[in-house]
Amino acid sequence: MLFRSMGKAGQIAMNIATTFCSTGIPSVFLHPSEAQHGDLGILQKNDLLLLISNSGKTREIVELTRLAHNLDPDLKFIVITGNPDSPLAQESDVCLSTGKPAEVCTLGMTPTTSTTAMTVIGDILVVQTMKKTQFTIEEYSKRHHGGYLGEKSRSLCEK
């Protein structure tokens, strides 16, 4: 899976990508500007793009959908957005709407509530994929060598 996004949504995309990696699904975050300068070559047949944009209008992300389709016309897109009528949503194979929640910051602009919704949707995708692939604690422990999660997962395997 390849993840692309900008700004605060980009940080959410990075988190979702690393969570997929730790649960057995090879994933990478690709910054849209780097993709336009050759890194789009990471795309392979049967890859899936997950794009995140609250507005669904982020120029760099919309441009990337066209560039990626030029590279592989069969490439599938999932979009997480607060605007299911946006250009990005229209390009997607699957649109997952955040419901366009009002931002809780005093200005109503800083990504707060929207990024929380994006994170929740990403976590749901990870958990459902883990169920579908029947990802086990043994597989988890092989990917988590350090820290508390590594220690805990290894101890669960020993039982």
Give the location of each predicted region.
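Internal, active-site/partner-interface "lid" segment
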Residues: P87-Q90, V104, K131-K159
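Glycine-rich phosphate-binding loops that contact phosphosugars or nucleotide phosphates
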Residues: M6-T133
